[in-house]
């Protein structure tokens, strides 16, 4: 049993912390939003009035926060309250630069630190099937595994500090391109008189198969649990995809890489997010269908 401080108890943090409680760990939580805090408390998290209070008696600190700036402020706020050699795990999605900065900040205070962003969305968090992409020392990851495993379907060591975030932005750029391509295919199928079920059966049994269709199918019917069957209530929102693509484009610019498809996907999602940020990112099919009907 480990005492864990979990900072950020929102859509992802709430089910993740609940799974840690279910695995027998003691979880001390903090979130500035009262509804998030009370929801976590209902699942066995001991909620504190401030982040430093939550961290004070913890062996491990997990952060799941919205931006790199928020993560930096959080670390600055809590590091002095942490016990020596506390393990910090940041599962937020932030830039590689920010990840390396908070890693250095934690190390300067005598702490261990990993960047460990996740893939799998709210469903994966609830089902404890998240993929953790981890950057940091292998020895530190060995210490972290018993804490990550109750939340994980897969844990992948990607390299040194920042490598987890590098893997996350690359993965989500691929995902965005795939989701748009799948949406384009279903819109074209409609125009050709091909049923959605027939196209789904072909793609999932052929070379076009990917998560964007077999799990996140953008049309109602073929996958009953996909957001398309629930008014596109987000498993992974357009706002978050737009944020992640922004991080990817920043990385492309900083490294001098080229990403023509990723750049086009970023442009499509930036425009779609202006009015539909709260929908699942598979709802991008709406804008593609509108273009086809124009």
Curated annotation (Swiss-Prot):
The active site is at 168. Coiled coil: none annotated. It comes from the Bacteria. It catalyses: 3-hydroxy-2-methylpropanoate + NAD(+) = 2-methyl-3-oxopropanoate + NADH + H(+). The keyword Oxidoreductase applies. One of its GO terms (biological process) is valine catabolic process. Belongs to the HIBADH-related family. This is Probable 3-hydroxyisobutyrate dehydrogenase. It comes from Mycobacterium tuberculosis (strain ATCC 25618 / H37Rv).
